[in-house]
Amino acid sequence: MHPFSVGTFFKHLSVSPPKPSVLKPISKSLVAVASAAPPGTSHFGALNSHQKQQVHVYIDSLLQWNQKMNLTAVREESEVMERHIEDSLAIIQPIRNSYVSRCGASSENLKIVDVGTGAGLPGLILAIACPDWKVTLLESLNKRCQFLEHVAGETGLSNVEVIRERAENLWQNQNFRESFDVAIARAVAEMRILAEYCLPLVRVGGLFVAAKGHDPQVPLLAISLNYTRNK
């Protein structure tokens, strides 16, 4: 199991969308947790039979589509389960805990945006495991969006929306700016850049969760959290 370090920003001030790379000293809160399961623990095993079937449909589709396009470097089903499925499922409880403790609200019926979702990780897996969450998958590449829409259709997920757009453009749309309870990004850019992309999408009182897997660098994470967006 490859551990995640999850950095969680609590958005408590209403701010204007940022100009690129304009940062100032901190005004957000942080929770950093390790979300890897103990050896022998299976988050997949806690899913119901229907959810497990949906995950298998996802894995089959991922491996098939991966033969004609670059979705993941992983080629074996067992490795997909370990590196992608279990890792994605492992961040659910930290997200719930952080949302309840930081936002003082229920972690049910959340509006989630997965920024730079790629192959739908972790967003599609979160949508399967948490059917009460409304998950928006944000991806800029058309072929990947086609894959995401295919999987959403094959798995029968009604709580998933696929949007083809870049994060730095989406927040300029009034329909999406500050409209999500939680924004999630997984290893798509440096922490500071992730914050600039994701924070404009999060409502006041919401969370930005940065999941950095495979040898998480806690000092770098801590340094990055000393900055937030300028007005």
Residue ranges and their predicted role:
Residues 1-83:
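N-terminal auxiliary segments of SAM/dcSAM-dependent transferases
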Residues 45, 69, 155-158, 228-231:
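Residues at alpha-helix termini
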Residues 62, 126, 212:
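Residue-level signal for inorganic ion chemistry
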Residues 66, 151-152, 224-227:
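Conserved hydrophobic residues forming the short capping helix/wall of the S-adenosyl-L-methionine
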Residues 89-188, 193-196:
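Conserved SAM/SAH cofactor-binding pocket of Class I
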Residues 196-231:
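C-terminal substrate-binding/active-site "lid" region of AdoMet-derived donor-dependent transferases
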